Amino acid sequence: MSEMKKTLVSGLPQLGLELTEETCDTLCAFGVAMVKQNEVMNLTGITDDRGVAKAHLLDSLTVMACADLTGKTLIDVGCGAGFPGVPLAIASGAKVTLLDSLGKRMKWLETVLPQLGIDAECVTARAEEAVAAR
């Protein structure tokens, strides 16, 4: 088991969360993909396995300790590398929209999410433009 997965799995009880093995694997696969992409595009300063699990994955999941998101619709405005939106899309049962103005980041998310079987809508726009368009 990777250090990222060990850290993720050991941190879940502290949040009062239980996730399936498959969900944990998908979360870690996204973390690994983000670290790999970070080699060519500045996505994060946190790239070690434990740091990614704690500062990106577990921190993103903390909202699930406070609210049942199953069937809810969420938008992650200024999603950057996909946190907290992508982990919530993976683990919560919510329909998630990722919104960011930086096209390079969104193009990467549009590519990697389907590869990992992650269902989230990606919208490249500034928040005020997205609101005006609706």
Summary of predicted features, one role per range:
Residues S2-G71, I75, R105-K107, T111-D119:
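Class I SAM-dependent transferase core
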Residues L61-R134:
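Conserved SAM/SAH cofactor-binding pocket of Class I
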